[in-house]
Amino acid sequence: MSSQICRSASRAARSLLSSAKNARFFSEGRAIGAASVVHATGKVPQYASNFGKSGSGFVSNSWITGLLALPAAAFMLQDQEALAAEMERTFIAIKPDGVQRGLISEIITRFERKGYKLVGIKVMVPSKGFAQKHYHDLKERPFFNGLCNFLSSGPVVAMVWEGEGVIRYGRKLIGATDPQKSEPGTIRGDLAVVVGRNIIHGSDGPETAKDEISLWFKPEELVSYTSNAEKWIYGQN
């Protein structure tokens, strides 16, 4: 279940609970239990229809129906910090050719315009040994040595970006490894011509992202913060 659904369910559930805060049905947490069972089994349990009574009469059936309809009721008490923890992080590097061609701001702008958040950045010239660690999964390929020589040939802008779906969509923003096969609108499709000079690298999965971030950055070099734009990007209130 996406965190967007969780957020929507959380807001709706809190509204329902606030409107019915004096009802024993809600104060005893029975609504949460009933909704959780409905979400897990697809069936309304018998007890759910019997818990509408309170000391002052019957709780409005519309409130009960509305609450039981929430598919994410089990998550409705998650706060903003818990949701922030669901954000992915990915490693993105602008290679020496991208740096030398003055494309740093262009590439950063594309990620920012999408709504992703920069949480780590540095400029460095990696050694060949460091480049070999970065490309360790390609060490059996015939082009491995050339890749390492090129990555260590000049300055690299190493970055960590954060956001929902940033690993998968970051790859889409970058485009195919071969710029000739990259769609127009992607970074490589618009700004690169040949495979050997495709200007940018991006993690291809969660485990790769974790490994590459830990290789290029120390934990204290990454920051965690809430951007003022997040409520406009993700709909958080």
From Swiss-Prot:
Q: Which PROSITE patterns match?
A: NDPK (PS00469), NDPK_LIKE (PS51374)
Q: Care to name a GO molecular-function term for this sequence?
A: ATP binding
**Record's keyword terms, sorted:** ATP-binding, Chloroplast, Kinase, Magnesium, Metal-binding, Mitochondrion, Nucleotide metabolism, Nucleotide-binding, Plastid, Thylakoid, Transferase, Transit peptide
Q: Its catalytic activity?
A: a 2'-deoxyribonucleoside 5'-diphosphate + ATP = a 2'-deoxyribonucleoside 5'-triphosphate + ADP; a ribonucleoside 5'-diphosphate + ATP = a ribonucleoside 5'-triphosphate + ADP
Instruction: Report the EC code(s) recorded for this entry.
Output: 2.7.4.6
- What are the subcellular locations of this protein? Plastid, Chloroplast thylakoid lumen; Mitochondrion intermembrane space
The protein's assembly and partners: Homohexamer.
According to its UniProt record, which protein family does this protein belong to?
Answer: Belongs to the NDK family.
| Cross-referenced NCBIfam families | PRK00668.1
What is this protein's function? Major role in the synthesis of nucleoside triphosphates other than ATP. The ATP gamma phosphate is transferred to the NDP beta phosphate via a ping-pong mechanism, using a phosphorylated active-site intermediate. Shows the highest specificity towards GDP.
Q: What is this protein called?
A: Nucleoside diphosphate kinase IV, chloroplastic/mitochondrial
**What organism, scientifically named, is this protein from?**
Arabidopsis thaliana
**The organism's lineage?**
Eukaryota, Viridiplantae, Streptophyta, Embryophyta, Tracheophyta
Which gene underlies this protein? NDK4
